[in-house]
Regions:
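Extended, charged low-complexity regulatory segments
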Residues: 1-185, 189-197, 428
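P-loop NTPase Walker
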Residues: 2-8, 15, 19, 163-166, ...
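Short N-terminal helix-initiation segments at or just after the protein's N-terminus
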Residues: 19-22, 147-150, 180-192, 342, ...
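Generic detector of solvent-exposed, compositionally biased contiguous segments
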Residues: 38-58, 196-207, 212-224, 228, ...
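Alpha-helical nucleic-acid-binding subdomain
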Residues: 103, 108-109, 191, 226-424, ...
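Short, well-ordered alpha-helical scaffold segments within catalytic/effector domains
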Residues: 181, 185, 189-193, 215, ...
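Short gly/ser/thr-rich secondary-structure transition/capping motifs
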Residues: 186, 379-385, 557-563
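Conserved helicase motor core of SF1/SF2 NTP-dependent helicases
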Residues: 238, 247-248, 255-263, 268, ...
């Protein structure tokens, strides 16, 4: 005799099979339209041709949606009954919720108004229709699933009379970590729903520590704005831009957004975006230059003088040659080292974030608005060639700024100036306690952003890491909240390598080589013993050491990534090796030691970077160096 759990699981499998059969029927109807040869369409008359092409594109989009439904048809089911005197609607009804609507199987999209009922406890609740009508219902049963490639990997069930119960849970691989228990997933989804369904108009901020799910919340809000009938006309996907820190994050987003049904969204780094505006095709971007503090001080002295920007009363003039514009600005500095350093930049044709920000500020003041000007040649009658310039004023329906805390206030102001007045919609994602750049935003007032308190979402719990990793971070005096149901993992390994004494002559270089060889050997053992599917991140502040490690292991395993800590922000690995830990790893240049405010902010950035490094791992961390990490942090107080 079957148990109740077995019967429930069998019923779920029957439903999944029913969906698959219904999808197979839909495939047969859609395929002839979705895959109609373009040659056949081109044979049609003009009006018919355009109509056939639209039908083909629509059918192809639906075909891709059906493929996604087939893999993961739904993630929630509610058994409901409407609270009404009309007997036609008082019978119980099963409704499912998934990524895409499939009305043939009573599956609603997650953005449908009724989808909010999945967060209610069994019993009486309500939902609101787009026209404002409130529908009162009773939720009799709830079921939550995780279905991957048509296979059930998680299933929980609850009713009005019985609390939530786990029906089935498959073993989860280390790649994604153990499942973080239903109640935690449910809490995240409630926060997600509050975020995605908030009014579209105006700025929104989502903050939280690394691994708290803030990026997921932000991107689901984007998906909702693009797909919801109430907002989709205001947010065409090709009018949305997402600003990311680096190419690695860009690649991650470029895969994640289509999975949420979002296509044609622009994803750019600040430099890529600025390059289109300023025509920096032959310029290389560098993170920071040696005169960072001098440049920041000069930037902070720029005053808006109405029609012109000024420094100490002197007008800054715009030149199409960005290097000439910046040379004129830096000529106003009293720092000879800045002037000399920038001359070297001109020779190498490199610009940093401060250079580009100043140039964009000048461009905007000169042009009035940020715009992209594209030149092309047009062939006129009699073969005459005329140069044509197309001007596109930047006017985005939505701007998403990932890791907003790493931008200068002026950068954020430039982004904000390109947002449509119809929406004024910006989503800021990040955490002010994870800054990796000097001179960046400290508070919203820094660039005149006013975000209502109820639109500032703060996540506290971390879901990416193991309990042991967060306990280790807490032992280093980082303020971390550790969820009770968080997965367990191996204890953090901290290896201090001892210097081996040799001859007095060249002892320092010998010791350095000896320690480095021990680090290489340790890393080699980790790579030998790891399973094939596990990803490894080798992280360091020491770029030279990182380069030698990359060269040493370049042919060992392509799943191993060698990154600076700053480059690793937003990336995650199964195993992380933090290498090059020493008491000298955060020494400031002597010329900056007399600037207490600069030194204090730099020390805080270094502490934040260490926290970022520790939270890159989903399972296992090895800290390797000549001293303990706790000793390094003592020097940063």
């Amino acid at each position: 005799m079957k148990t109740i759990k077995e019967e429930l699981l069998e019923k779920l499998h029957t439903k999944i099979d029913s969906v698959k059969h219904a999808i197979a029927d839909q495939y047969e109807k859609i395929k002839p339209i979705a895959f109609k040869p373009e040659t056949d369409i081109l044979k049609l008359r003009k009006g018919e041709r355009e109509h056939a092409m639209i039908l083909r594109l629509t059918a192809l989009a639906r075909y891709k949606e059906l493929q996604a439904i087939e893999s993961s048809p739904f993630f929630f089911k509610c058994v409901i009954a409407h609270n009404t005197v009309d007997v036609r609607y008082r019978n119980k009804k099963e409704i499912h919720f998934g990524k895409y609507e499939f009305s043939e199987q009573n599956i609603y999209s997650w953005i449908a108004p009724i989808a909010v009922v999945r967060f209610a406890n069994p019993g009486q609740t309500s939902f609101k229709l787009p026209n404002g009508t409130v529908k009162e219902i009773t939720v009799h049963e709830k079921e939550q699933y995780m279905i991957v490639n048509g296979k059930v990997v998680f299933y929980a069930h609850e009713t009005q009379d019985h609390p939530r119960e786990l029906i089935y849970q498959e073993h989860f691989s280390a790649k994604k970590g153990a499942f973080i228990l239903p109640e935690i997933v449910e809490i995240m989804e409630k926060a997600q729903d509050d975020v995605i369904r908030a009014s579209h108009f105006g700025p929104f901020a989502i903050a939280g520590p690394a691994g708290s799910g803030k990026t997921t919340l932000a991107l689901h809000r984007v998906a909702y704005l693009v797909q919801s009938p109430e907002s989709m006309d205001l947010y065409p996907s090709n009018s949305i831009i997402v600003f990311v820190q680096d190419s690695g994050t860009k690649e991650y987003f470029s895969h994640l957004l289509p999975d949420l049904g979002i296509h044609n969204v622009k994803i750019k780094t600040f430099f890529e975006w600025a390059s289109e505006i300023l025509k920096l095709d032959t310029v290389a971007y560098v993170q920071n230059t040696e005169c960072e503090l001098d440049k920041l001080n000069l930037k902070n002295s720029v005053v808006d003088g109405g029609e012109k920007l000024k420094i100490d009363g002197e007008v800054i003039t715009w030149n199409k040659n960005v290097f000439q514009t910046l040379r004129g600005i830096y000529a106003m500095s009293s720092s000879e080292s800045l002037k000399n350093s920038f001359e070297e930049q001109i020779k190498r044709r490199t610009l940093d974030r401060i250079d580009i920000t100043l140039a964009l500020m000048m461009y905007k003041k000169h042009k009035g608005k940020l715009k992209i000007e594209t030149e092309s040649n047009r062939v006129m009658r009699m073969g005459k060639i005329v140069k044509h310039t197309r001007v596109d004023v930047l006017d985005y329906s939505l701007v998403v700024v990932d890791e907003f805390q790493n931008y200068l206030p002026e950068q954020l102001q430039l982004f904000k100036s390109c947002v449509s007045s119809k929406t004024e919609s910006v989503i800021y994602v990040g955490d002010l306690s994870q800054k990796i750049q000097h001179g960046t935003i400290k508070k919203w007032d820094d660039f005149s952003e006013n975000i209502a308190p109820d639109r500032q979402i703060r996540l506290h719990k971390v879901y990416r890491n193991t309990k042991q990793i967060l306990e280790y971070a807490r032992s280093l005096d980082y303020k971390v909240e550790i969820p009770e149901a968080l997965k367990e993992g191996p204890v953090v390994q901290e290896k201090v390598f001892e210097e081996v004494r040799g001859e007095v002559e060249n002892a320092a270089s010998q010791n350095s080589r000896n320690i480095e060889s021990q680090v290489f050997e340790y890393v080699e053992n980790i790579l030998k013993n790891k399973t094939a599917e596990k990803s490894v991140g080798i992280l360091s502040f020491n770029l030279e050491l990182l380069t030698r490690l990359r060269e040493r292991f370049k042919d060992v395993d392509t799943s191993v990534k060698f990154l600076t800590i700053a480059e690793s922000q937003g990336v995650e690995f199964d195993i992380v090796c933090l290498v090059g830990v020493s008491n000298h790893m955060f020494e400031l240049a002597e010329r900056y030691s007399t600037h207490p405010a600069f030194r204090e902010e730099k020390h805080q950035i270094y502490k934040d970077l260490l926290y970022i490094a520790l939270t890159r791992s989903m399972n296992e961390i090895h800290v390797l160096g000549t001293c303990r990490l706790k000793d390094v942090l003592v020097n940063l107080k």
